[in-house]
UniProtKB/Swiss-Prot annotation:
Gene3D superfamilies: Alpha-D-Glucose-1,6-Bisphosphate, subunit A, domain 3, Alpha-D-phosphohexomutase, C-terminal domain
Pfam (any one): PGM_PMM_III
HAMAP family: GlmM_B
BP terms from Gene Ontology: carbohydrate metabolic process; peptidoglycan biosynthetic process; UDP-N-acetylglucosamine biosynthetic process
Assigned EC number: 5.4.2.10
Identification of the protein by name: Phosphoglucosamine mutase
Gene source species: Francisella tularensis subsp. tularensis (strain WY96-3418)
Active site as annotated: S101
Cofactor detail note: Binds 1 Mg(2+) ion per subunit.
Length: 443
Protein backbone atom coordinates (compact mmCIF):
# COMPACT_ATOMS: atom_id res chain seq x y z
CA UNK A 1 0.00 0.00 0.00
CA UNK A 2 1.38 3.43 -0.96
CA UNK A 3 2.79 5.47 1.91
CA UNK A 4 2.54 8.94 0.38
CA UNK A 5 0.87 8.72 -3.03
CA UNK A 6 -2.90 8.60 -3.43
CA UNK A 7 -4.94 8.10 -6.59
CA UNK A 8 -3.74 11.44 -7.96
CA UNK A 9 -0.36 12.38 -6.55
CA UNK A 10 0.32 13.44 -2.99
CA UNK A 11 -2.17 15.69 -1.22
CA UNK A 12 -3.08 16.98 2.22
CA UNK A 13 -3.57 19.97 4.48
CA UNK A 14 -0.54 22.23 4.34
CA UNK A 15 1.63 22.00 7.49
CA UNK A 16 -0.76 19.51 9.14
CA UNK A 17 -0.07 16.49 6.95
CA UNK A 18 2.64 15.19 4.67
CA UNK A 19 2.50 18.47 2.77
CA UNK A 20 5.25 20.50 4.43
CA UNK A 21 8.24 22.43 3.14
CA UNK A 22 10.53 19.73 4.49
CA UNK A 23 8.69 16.88 2.79
CA UNK A 24 8.34 18.72 -0.50
CA UNK A 25 12.07 19.43 -0.55
CA UNK A 26 12.79 15.75 0.10
CA UNK A 27 10.39 14.76 -2.67
CA UNK A 28 12.24 16.99 -5.11
CA UNK A 29 15.57 15.58 -4.04
CA UNK A 30 14.27 12.01 -4.23
CA UNK A 31 12.96 12.40 -7.77
CA UNK A 32 16.12 14.24 -8.77
CA UNK A 33 18.31 11.47 -7.40
CA UNK A 34 16.18 8.87 -9.18
CA UNK A 35 16.59 10.81 -12.43
CA UNK A 36 20.35 10.61 -11.92
CA UNK A 37 20.23 6.89 -11.18
CA UNK A 38 18.25 6.18 -14.34
CA UNK A 39 20.41 8.52 -16.42
CA UNK A 40 17.41 10.57 -17.58
CA UNK A 41 17.83 14.16 -18.81
CA UNK A 42 18.71 16.34 -15.81
CA UNK A 43 15.85 18.73 -16.46
CA UNK A 44 12.26 19.00 -15.18
CA UNK A 45 9.28 21.32 -15.54
CA UNK A 46 7.16 22.72 -12.69
CA UNK A 47 3.89 24.61 -12.49
CA UNK A 48 1.33 25.50 -9.85
CA UNK A 49 -2.26 26.55 -9.28
CA UNK A 50 -3.36 29.70 -7.45
CA UNK A 51 -3.21 28.59 -3.79
CA UNK A 52 -1.38 30.88 -1.39
CA UNK A 53 0.88 28.00 -0.33
CA UNK A 54 1.93 27.22 -3.89
CA UNK A 55 4.92 29.54 -3.98
CA UNK A 56 6.84 28.35 -0.95
CA UNK A 57 6.07 24.69 -1.67
CA UNK A 58 7.29 25.13 -5.24
CA UNK A 59 10.57 26.64 -4.11
CA UNK A 60 11.04 23.86 -1.57
CA UNK A 61 10.59 21.38 -4.41
CA UNK A 62 13.01 23.31 -6.61
CA UNK A 63 15.67 23.43 -3.89
CA UNK A 64 15.54 19.66 -3.51
CA UNK A 65 15.81 19.18 -7.26
CA UNK A 66 18.64 21.70 -7.64
CA UNK A 67 20.60 20.06 -4.82
CA UNK A 68 20.35 16.79 -6.76
CA UNK A 69 21.77 18.51 -9.83
CA UNK A 70 18.50 18.90 -11.73
CA UNK A 71 17.69 22.00 -13.79
CA UNK A 72 14.16 23.39 -13.34
CA UNK A 73 11.99 25.34 -15.79
CA UNK A 74 9.11 27.10 -14.00
CA UNK A 75 5.92 27.72 -16.00
CA UNK A 76 4.26 29.68 -13.19
CA UNK A 77 0.49 29.42 -12.70
CA UNK A 78 -0.78 27.10 -15.43
CA UNK A 79 -3.38 24.32 -15.70
CA UNK A 80 -2.10 20.83 -14.88
CA UNK A 81 -2.47 19.58 -18.49
CA UNK A 82 -0.16 22.37 -19.66
CA UNK A 83 2.62 20.93 -17.50
CA UNK A 84 2.05 17.48 -19.02
CA UNK A 85 2.06 18.99 -22.52
CA UNK A 86 5.26 20.98 -21.96
CA UNK A 87 7.00 18.03 -20.29
CA UNK A 88 6.59 16.05 -23.50
CA UNK A 89 7.32 18.97 -25.83
CA UNK A 90 10.52 19.99 -24.03
CA UNK A 91 11.60 16.38 -23.44
CA UNK A 92 11.93 16.88 -19.71
CA UNK A 93 12.58 13.97 -17.38
CA UNK A 94 9.48 14.82 -15.33
CA UNK A 95 6.80 17.42 -14.73
CA UNK A 96 5.53 18.60 -11.34
CA UNK A 97 2.37 20.53 -10.48
CA UNK A 98 1.87 22.08 -7.05
CA UNK A 99 -1.89 21.66 -6.71
CA UNK A 100 -4.65 20.06 -4.69
CA UNK A 101 -7.02 20.11 -7.64
CA UNK A 102 -10.63 20.59 -6.48
CA UNK A 103 -9.79 20.74 -2.75
CA UNK A 104 -10.05 23.86 -0.58
CA UNK A 105 -7.18 26.36 -0.39
CA UNK A 106 -5.89 25.00 2.94
CA UNK A 107 -4.86 21.82 1.11
CA UNK A 108 -2.11 21.45 -1.42
CA UNK A 109 -0.17 18.67 -3.06
CA UNK A 110 2.04 17.53 -5.87
CA UNK A 111 1.07 15.83 -9.13
CA UNK A 112 3.92 14.19 -10.96
CA UNK A 113 4.28 13.31 -14.65
CA UNK A 114 6.90 11.11 -16.26
CA UNK A 115 8.72 12.11 -19.45
CA UNK A 116 5.90 10.76 -21.66
CA UNK A 117 3.34 13.03 -19.99
CA UNK A 118 1.66 10.16 -18.16
CA UNK A 119 1.21 10.03 -14.40
CA UNK A 120 3.53 7.64 -12.59
CA UNK A 121 2.58 3.99 -12.36
CA UNK A 122 2.47 2.21 -9.00
CA UNK A 123 5.95 0.70 -9.37
CA UNK A 124 7.60 4.06 -10.05
CA UNK A 125 5.70 5.68 -7.19
CA UNK A 126 7.11 3.02 -4.87
CA UNK A 127 10.63 3.82 -6.08
CA UNK A 128 10.06 7.50 -5.37
CA UNK A 129 8.69 6.72 -1.89
CA UNK A 130 11.75 4.61 -1.08
CA UNK A 131 14.00 7.49 -2.14
CA UNK A 132 12.04 9.98 -0.03
CA UNK A 133 12.66 7.85 3.05
CA UNK A 134 16.39 7.66 2.25
CA UNK A 135 19.15 10.22 2.71
CA UNK A 136 19.05 13.71 1.20
CA UNK A 137 21.62 13.65 -1.60
CA UNK A 138 23.71 16.64 -2.67
CA UNK A 139 25.59 16.67 -5.93
CA UNK A 140 29.04 18.31 -5.97
CA UNK A 141 28.67 22.10 -6.01
CA UNK A 142 29.71 22.45 -9.64
CA UNK A 143 26.83 20.11 -10.57
CA UNK A 144 24.00 21.92 -8.75
CA UNK A 145 20.94 22.52 -10.93
CA UNK A 146 19.66 25.82 -12.29
CA UNK A 147 16.28 27.56 -12.07
CA UNK A 148 14.64 29.50 -14.91
CA UNK A 149 11.19 30.98 -15.51
CA UNK A 150 9.39 30.53 -18.83
CA UNK A 151 6.99 33.43 -19.37
CA UNK A 152 3.76 32.93 -21.31
CA UNK A 153 4.08 29.14 -21.39
CA UNK A 154 0.34 28.95 -22.04
CA UNK A 155 0.88 30.42 -25.53
CA UNK A 156 2.58 27.27 -26.84
CA UNK A 157 -0.24 25.10 -25.50
CA UNK A 158 -2.91 27.36 -27.00
CA UNK A 159 -1.21 27.41 -30.38
CA UNK A 160 -1.03 23.61 -30.43
CA UNK A 161 -4.79 23.28 -29.81
CA UNK A 162 -5.66 26.06 -32.24
CA UNK A 163 -3.62 24.54 -35.06
CA UNK A 164 -5.56 21.29 -34.72
CA UNK A 165 -9.08 22.58 -34.17
CA UNK A 166 -9.36 26.00 -35.82
CA UNK A 167 -11.10 24.48 -38.85
CA UNK A 168 -13.74 22.78 -36.68
CA UNK A 169 -14.66 25.52 -34.20
CA UNK A 170 -17.18 28.08 -35.40
CA UNK A 171 -19.47 28.22 -32.38
CA UNK A 172 -21.92 31.13 -32.45
CA UNK A 173 -23.64 30.58 -29.12
CA UNK A 174 -23.03 32.45 -25.89
CA UNK A 175 -20.85 30.65 -23.36
CA UNK A 176 -20.32 31.16 -19.64
CA UNK A 177 -17.08 29.80 -18.16
CA UNK A 178 -16.29 29.19 -14.48
CA UNK A 179 -12.54 29.03 -13.82
CA UNK A 180 -12.87 28.19 -10.09
CA UNK A 181 -10.51 31.08 -9.26
CA UNK A 182 -7.85 28.55 -10.19
CA UNK A 183 -5.16 27.85 -12.73
CA UNK A 184 -7.55 28.32 -15.67
CA UNK A 185 -8.12 31.95 -14.69
CA UNK A 186 -7.01 34.18 -17.58
CA UNK A 187 -5.52 31.13 -19.31
CA UNK A 188 -8.90 29.69 -20.37
CA UNK A 189 -10.01 33.12 -21.52
CA UNK A 190 -6.88 33.40 -23.69
CA UNK A 191 -7.73 30.06 -25.32
CA UNK A 192 -11.33 31.09 -25.99
CA UNK A 193 -10.18 34.43 -27.39
CA UNK A 194 -7.96 32.57 -29.85
CA UNK A 195 -11.03 30.75 -31.18
CA UNK A 196 -13.22 33.86 -31.25
CA UNK A 197 -15.74 32.50 -28.75
CA UNK A 198 -18.41 34.82 -27.32
CA UNK A 199 -18.10 34.19 -23.58
CA UNK A 200 -18.64 35.59 -20.11
CA UNK A 201 -16.10 34.58 -17.48
CA UNK A 202 -16.91 34.11 -13.79
CA UNK A 203 -14.79 32.99 -10.82
CA UNK A 204 -11.63 34.14 -12.56
CA UNK A 205 -10.11 36.46 -9.94
CA UNK A 206 -7.86 34.32 -7.75
CA UNK A 207 -6.55 35.76 -4.49
CA UNK A 208 -4.81 32.65 -3.15
CA UNK A 209 -7.68 31.81 -0.81
CA UNK A 210 -10.79 31.62 -3.00
CA UNK A 211 -9.87 28.68 -5.24
CA UNK A 212 -12.88 26.31 -5.55
CA UNK A 213 -14.90 28.33 -3.01
CA UNK A 214 -18.53 28.22 -4.14
CA UNK A 215 -17.45 27.75 -7.72
CA UNK A 216 -15.85 25.35 -10.18
CA UNK A 217 -16.59 21.82 -11.30
CA UNK A 218 -17.45 20.62 -7.79
CA UNK A 219 -19.99 23.43 -7.25
CA UNK A 220 -22.06 23.23 -10.41
CA UNK A 221 -24.81 25.42 -8.95
CA UNK A 222 -22.60 28.43 -9.69
CA UNK A 223 -22.42 27.82 -13.44
CA UNK A 224 -26.09 26.76 -13.59
CA UNK A 225 -27.13 30.07 -12.07
CA UNK A 226 -24.86 32.06 -14.38
CA UNK A 227 -26.13 30.33 -17.53
CA UNK A 228 -29.70 31.20 -16.63
CA UNK A 229 -28.85 34.80 -15.68
CA UNK A 230 -26.85 35.35 -18.88
CA UNK A 231 -29.38 33.47 -21.05
CA UNK A 232 -26.39 31.55 -22.36
CA UNK A 233 -26.34 28.52 -24.65
CA UNK A 234 -23.61 26.65 -22.80
CA UNK A 235 -21.82 26.70 -19.45
CA UNK A 236 -18.34 25.29 -18.88
CA UNK A 237 -17.00 24.75 -15.37
CA UNK A 238 -13.44 23.70 -14.54
CA UNK A 239 -11.80 22.80 -11.25
CA UNK A 240 -8.84 24.41 -9.49
CA UNK A 241 -6.13 22.95 -11.70
CA UNK A 242 -8.35 22.65 -14.81
CA UNK A 243 -7.97 18.93 -15.36
CA UNK A 244 -11.73 18.46 -14.79
CA UNK A 245 -14.66 19.80 -16.77
CA UNK A 246 -18.42 19.78 -16.19
CA UNK A 247 -20.81 21.51 -18.60
CA UNK A 248 -24.43 22.64 -18.42
CA UNK A 249 -26.87 23.05 -21.29
CA UNK A 250 -28.99 26.06 -22.21
CA UNK A 251 -31.55 25.03 -19.58
CA UNK A 252 -28.95 24.95 -16.82
CA UNK A 253 -28.96 21.15 -16.69
CA UNK A 254 -25.69 19.44 -15.79
CA UNK A 255 -23.77 17.17 -18.16
CA UNK A 256 -21.08 15.41 -16.14
CA UNK A 257 -18.00 13.52 -17.27
CA UNK A 258 -20.08 10.50 -18.30
CA UNK A 259 -22.26 12.70 -20.48
CA UNK A 260 -19.27 14.46 -21.99
CA UNK A 261 -17.69 11.11 -22.87
CA UNK A 262 -20.90 10.07 -24.58
CA UNK A 263 -20.86 13.23 -26.72
CA UNK A 264 -17.23 12.64 -27.69
CA UNK A 265 -18.05 9.03 -28.54
CA UNK A 266 -20.87 10.10 -30.87
CA UNK A 267 -18.57 12.50 -32.72
CA UNK A 268 -15.27 10.72 -32.27
CA UNK A 269 -14.29 11.42 -35.89
CA UNK A 270 -13.90 15.10 -34.97
CA UNK A 271 -11.89 14.10 -31.91
CA UNK A 272 -9.41 11.85 -33.69
CA UNK A 273 -11.36 8.59 -33.50
CA UNK A 274 -11.40 5.72 -31.00
CA UNK A 275 -12.04 1.98 -31.04
CA UNK A 276 -13.84 2.10 -27.71
CA UNK A 277 -14.51 4.07 -24.53
CA UNK A 278 -13.04 3.68 -21.05
CA UNK A 279 -15.21 4.74 -18.12
CA UNK A 280 -14.85 3.86 -14.44
CA UNK A 281 -16.62 1.98 -11.70
CA UNK A 282 -18.67 5.15 -11.16
CA UNK A 283 -19.92 5.47 -14.75
CA UNK A 284 -23.71 5.44 -14.87
CA UNK A 285 -25.12 2.13 -16.11
CA UNK A 286 -27.31 3.97 -18.61
CA UNK A 287 -24.21 4.94 -20.60
CA UNK A 288 -22.81 1.43 -20.50
CA UNK A 289 -26.13 0.10 -21.83
CA UNK A 290 -26.14 2.79 -24.53
CA UNK A 291 -22.62 1.97 -25.69
CA UNK A 292 -23.35 -1.73 -25.87
CA UNK A 293 -26.61 -1.14 -27.76
CA UNK A 294 -24.66 0.89 -30.32
CA UNK A 295 -21.83 -1.65 -30.50
CA UNK A 296 -19.29 0.75 -29.00
CA UNK A 297 -16.84 -1.26 -26.89
CA UNK A 298 -16.84 -0.05 -23.29
CA UNK A 299 -14.85 -1.05 -20.23
CA UNK A 300 -14.69 0.16 -16.63
CA UNK A 301 -11.40 1.06 -14.96
CA UNK A 302 -10.71 1.75 -11.33
CA UNK A 303 -11.55 5.32 -10.29
CA UNK A 304 -8.71 7.75 -10.99
CA UNK A 305 -7.67 9.23 -14.30
CA UNK A 306 -4.34 7.41 -14.26
CA UNK A 307 -6.23 4.10 -14.15
CA UNK A 308 -8.39 5.27 -17.05
CA UNK A 309 -5.16 6.02 -18.89
CA UNK A 310 -3.71 2.60 -18.10
CA UNK A 311 -6.76 0.89 -19.60
CA UNK A 312 -6.79 3.18 -22.63
CA UNK A 313 -3.24 2.06 -23.37
CA UNK A 314 -3.98 -1.57 -22.51
CA UNK A 315 -7.00 -1.86 -24.82
CA UNK A 316 -5.79 0.49 -27.54
CA UNK A 317 -8.66 2.95 -27.06
CA UNK A 318 -8.20 6.72 -27.30
CA UNK A 319 -11.02 8.36 -25.33
CA UNK A 320 -11.93 7.80 -21.69
CA UNK A 321 -12.76 9.56 -18.47
CA UNK A 322 -14.59 9.79 -15.19
CA UNK A 323 -17.99 10.98 -14.00
CA UNK A 324 -16.18 13.69 -12.04
CA UNK A 325 -15.02 15.32 -15.27
CA UNK A 326 -11.54 14.00 -15.99
CA UNK A 327 -11.61 13.42 -19.75
CA UNK A 328 -8.61 12.03 -21.66
CA UNK A 329 -8.13 11.94 -25.43
CA UNK A 330 -4.89 10.17 -26.31
CA UNK A 331 -5.13 11.42 -29.87
CA UNK A 332 -4.01 14.80 -28.60
CA UNK A 333 -2.89 14.57 -24.97
CA UNK A 334 -1.84 12.38 -22.07
CA UNK A 335 -3.96 13.44 -19.11
CA UNK A 336 -7.32 14.87 -18.04
CA UNK A 337 -7.64 18.26 -19.70
CA UNK A 338 -10.62 20.54 -19.07
CA UNK A 339 -9.54 23.25 -21.52
CA UNK A 340 -8.86 20.95 -24.44
CA UNK A 341 -12.05 18.97 -23.78
CA UNK A 342 -13.97 22.26 -23.90
CA UNK A 343 -12.55 23.00 -27.36
CA UNK A 344 -13.46 19.50 -28.58
CA UNK A 345 -17.02 20.07 -27.38
CA UNK A 346 -17.18 23.49 -29.04
CA UNK A 347 -15.99 21.85 -32.26
CA UNK A 348 -18.77 19.25 -32.00
CA UNK A 349 -21.43 21.84 -31.13
CA UNK A 350 -20.30 23.89 -34.15
CA UNK A 351 -21.15 21.03 -36.52
CA UNK A 352 -24.86 20.71 -35.79
CA UNK A 353 -27.56 23.36 -35.60
CA UNK A 354 -29.19 22.18 -32.39
CA UNK A 355 -29.03 23.16 -28.72
CA UNK A 356 -26.58 21.52 -26.33
CA UNK A 357 -29.43 19.70 -24.57
CA UNK A 358 -30.05 17.63 -27.71
CA UNK A 359 -26.52 16.24 -27.65
CA UNK A 360 -27.23 14.51 -24.34
CA UNK A 361 -28.24 10.88 -23.89
CA UNK A 362 -32.02 11.01 -24.12
CA UNK A 363 -34.26 9.44 -21.50
CA UNK A 364 -33.88 8.98 -17.76
CA UNK A 365 -30.49 7.97 -16.43
CA UNK A 366 -30.14 5.41 -13.68
CA UNK A 367 -30.38 7.18 -10.34
CA UNK A 368 -27.23 7.36 -8.24
CA UNK A 369 -26.90 8.21 -4.56
CA UNK A 370 -23.34 8.87 -3.41
CA UNK A 371 -22.57 9.46 0.27
CA UNK A 372 -19.08 10.22 1.59
CA UNK A 373 -18.51 8.70 5.03
CA UNK A 374 -15.67 10.37 7.01
CA UNK A 375 -13.41 7.89 8.79
CA UNK A 376 -10.74 8.28 11.44
CA UNK A 377 -8.13 6.75 9.13
CA UNK A 378 -7.78 5.64 5.54
CA UNK A 379 -9.63 2.39 4.99
CA UNK A 380 -7.86 -0.50 3.30
CA UNK A 381 -9.75 -2.67 0.86
CA UNK A 382 -9.48 -5.62 3.24
CA UNK A 383 -11.42 -3.58 5.83
CA UNK A 384 -14.40 -3.69 3.49
CA UNK A 385 -14.83 -7.38 4.29
CA UNK A 386 -16.43 -6.25 7.54
CA UNK A 387 -19.41 -4.94 5.59
CA UNK A 388 -19.35 -7.51 2.77
CA UNK A 389 -22.46 -9.31 4.03
CA UNK A 390 -24.36 -6.01 4.21
CA UNK A 391 -23.37 -5.18 0.64
CA UNK A 392 -24.52 -8.63 -0.42
CA UNK A 393 -27.91 -8.06 1.23
CA UNK A 394 -28.38 -4.81 -0.69
CA UNK A 395 -27.34 -6.41 -3.97
CA UNK A 396 -29.92 -9.14 -3.44
CA UNK A 397 -32.64 -6.57 -2.82
CA UNK A 398 -31.65 -4.59 -5.92
CA UNK A 399 -31.47 -7.62 -8.19
CA UNK A 400 -31.08 -6.42 -11.77
CA UNK A 401 -32.43 -2.97 -10.88
CA UNK A 402 -29.08 -1.54 -9.82
CA UNK A 403 -25.64 -2.00 -8.31
CA UNK A 404 -23.48 -1.09 -5.29
CA UNK A 405 -19.98 0.38 -5.06
CA UNK A 406 -17.96 1.00 -1.91
CA UNK A 407 -14.74 2.83 -2.68
CA UNK A 408 -12.11 4.21 -0.31
CA UNK A 409 -10.92 7.66 -1.33
CA UNK A 410 -7.36 7.70 -2.57
CA UNK A 411 -6.68 11.17 -1.18
CA UNK A 412 -8.46 11.43 2.18
CA UNK A 413 -9.90 9.25 5.01
CA UNK A 414 -13.31 8.88 3.41
CA UNK A 415 -15.32 5.89 2.20
CA UNK A 416 -17.55 6.62 -0.77
CA UNK A 417 -20.81 4.66 -0.70
CA UNK A 418 -22.64 4.62 -4.02
CA UNK A 419 -25.88 2.87 -4.87
CA UNK A 420 -27.35 3.02 -8.37
CA UNK A 421 -30.93 2.01 -9.11
CA UNK A 422 -33.79 2.71 -11.48
CA UNK A 423 -35.59 4.57 -8.68
CA UNK A 424 -34.05 7.44 -6.69
CA UNK A 425 -35.73 6.62 -3.40
CA UNK A 426 -34.58 3.01 -3.67
CA UNK A 427 -30.99 4.11 -4.32
CA UNK A 428 -31.07 6.58 -1.43
CA UNK A 429 -32.63 4.17 1.06
CA UNK A 430 -30.12 1.43 0.30
CA UNK A 431 -27.19 3.87 0.39
CA UNK A 432 -28.28 5.18 3.78
CA UNK A 433 -28.62 1.60 5.04
CA UNK A 434 -25.03 0.88 4.01
CA UNK A 435 -23.77 4.12 5.54
CA UNK A 436 -25.19 3.07 8.92
CA UNK A 437 -23.47 -0.32 8.63
CA UNK A 438 -20.19 1.37 7.72
CA UNK A 439 -20.45 3.69 10.73
CA UNK A 440 -21.15 0.73 13.01
CA UNK A 441 -18.31 -1.45 11.75
CA UNK A 442 -15.59 0.81 10.34
CA UNK A 443 -15.73 4.17 12.13
Amino acid sequence: MAKYFGTDGIRGEVANSTITVEFTQKLGNAVGSLINQKNYPKFVIVGQDTRSSGGFLKFALVSGLNAAGIDVLDLGVVPTPVVAFMTVKYRAAAGFVITASHNKFTDNGIKLFSSNGFKLDDALEEEVEDMIDGDFIYQPQFKFGSYKILANAIDEYIESIHSRFAKFVNYKGKVVVDCAHGAASHNFEALLDKFGINYVSIASNPDGLNINVGCGATCVSNIKKAVKEQKADLGISLDGDADRIIIVDENGQEIDGDGILNILAQYSDICGGTNGIVGTQMTNMSYENHYRANKIPFIRSKVGDRYVLEDLVKYGYKIGGESSGHVINLNFGTTGDGLFTAIQLLAIFSQADKPVSEFKLQGELMQQTLINVPLTKKVAREDLQKVASDVNDVEKRLGNRGRVLLRPSGTEPVLRVMVEADDKSLATNEAEYLVEKVKQKLV
